[in-house]
Amino acid sequence: MLESLTLQPIALVNGTVNLPGSKSVSNRALLLAALAEGTTQLNNVLDSDDIRHMLNALQALGVNFRLSADRTCCEVDGLGGKLVAEQPLSLFLGNAGTAMRPLAAVLCLGNSDIVLTGEPRMKERPIGHLVDALRQGGAQIDYLEQENYPPLRLRGGFRGGELTVDGRVSSQFLTALLMTAPLAEQDTTIRIMGDLVSKPYIDITLHLMKAFGIDVGHENYQIFHIKGGQTYRSPGTYLVEGDASSASYFLAAAAIKGGTVRVTGIGKKSVQGDTKFADVLEKMGAKVTWGDDYIECSRGELQGIDMDMNHIPDAAMTIATTALFATGPTTIRNIYNWRVKETDRLTAMATELRKVGAEVEEGEDYIRVVPPVQLTAADIGTYDDHRMAMCFSLVALSDTPVTILDPKCTAKTFPDYFEQFARLSQLA
């Protein structure tokens, strides 16, 4: 029997949340620190399953690091070049896309023999476009089970050169190539085919590479030029900003049942595109205030919206449950890549929204939500997807309780989410 957590109806949310570190930034920073020359102190690192998978992999590859007791500060001794394994090695990466994709690329630089594998869901998450691009650059990669999916066997050989990669499935493929290319022997030119999804995540990658001493030129995110034979250099210390996707639940809760909630660790200067989530809440009618290192949200009369949310794919999920509290329908468009995340999020979201009484239209790349007059108490399936669990906690901001099945799945990015949510909540 799955564990479950029942949230009783909440009358008001109010308070401040210091956000855990960003998953996207933490795993990129850990990998660059490992590749860099010098020692890097990373502060406000996220402590979650996805990060532990990256740390375990780096340790197996001979990287020395020291973690503080609460695992949020990590001092990494960089190797000043590529990661190599002296003997054949198998690395288990759970369901961490932010570890699997970049490591698949970076580990093609040497001539090590390395297998990358993970949980059953990881074996359903496509990686073929990345493998194709790496092979264009000379990498030797074999699929061990299903063509185009992990597990992979890597045997090095990547030298750079002219690469093309499909931009339509995941921006992590491009992120992986960008982080790898400076260490290749040759200069690299990467051409993007199709529209690049989740562009703001590429900005995170470019920002981090710059922090570690490497500039990348690009032509309108369609062609990227990277010089080969470079070395990443430690910035000394690097502060990981708060996780903007994680902020979305607290900001949405305030929009629905504030009070006022302030999230700290992100703000005007944030490198994460998911901070744009606050603009969507504002469009719906919430009151939003921005500081340099905080965003604050207060309740407003929420109206449904119809919007392309390709630029905030993770935080957009939170809009789907916020829509339950708006007047009129909400349509979230251009989110095909929800289908290749931790689960097929479009189908999962449609299924669970219907359980609480919403009328839902699920398209190939959009979802339309018509809120019910009265929400229905339901047991919410979470599909081993941290964001499903967190999104549906918002249902309790009504006069109806909600039961979340397998609440511990939030450990992927936010182990103490439900404690933080409860801390802000005053029960009806």
Swiss-Prot record:
- Origin species, per record, is Yersinia pseudotuberculosis serotype O:1b (strain IP 31758)
Q: What positions does the entry give for phosphoenolpyruvate binding?
A: K23, G97, R125, Q172, R345, R387, K412
Subcellular localization, as worded in the UniProt entry: Cytoplasm
Lineage summary: Bacteria, Pseudomonadati, Pseudomonadota, Gammaproteobacteria, Enterobacterales
Active site residues per record: D314
Q: Which residues take part in binding 3-phosphoshikimate?
A: K23, S24, R28, S170, S171, Q172, S198, D314, N337, K341
* Protein keywords: Amino-acid biosynthesis, Aromatic amino acid biosynthesis, Cytoplasm, Transferase
Which gene specifies this protein's sequence? aroA
EC assignment: 2.5.1.19
Record's Pfam families?
EPSP_synthase
Its chief place of residence is cytoplasm
Can you quote a single GO CC term? cytoplasm
What SUPFAM superfamilies does its record include?
EPT/RTPC-like
Name this polypeptide is given: 3-phosphoshikimate 1-carboxyvinyltransferase
Say which family it is in: Belongs to the EPSP synthase family.
On subunit structure and binding partners, the annotation says: Monomer.
Q: What InterPro entries has UniProt attached to this entry?
A: Enolpyruvate_Tfrase_dom, Enolpyruvate_Tfrase_sf, EPSP_synthase, EPSP_synthase_CS, RNA3'P_cycl/enolpyr_Trfase_a/b
What GO molecular function terms would the record report? 3-phosphoshikimate 1-carboxyvinyltransferase activity
**Per its UniProt entry, which superkingdom is the organism in?**
Bacteria
From the UniProt record, give one GO term of the biological process aspect.
amino acid biosynthetic process
Give the catalytic activity. Answer: 3-phosphoshikimate + phosphoenolpyruvate = 5-O-(1-carboxyvinyl)-3-phosphoshikimate + phosphate
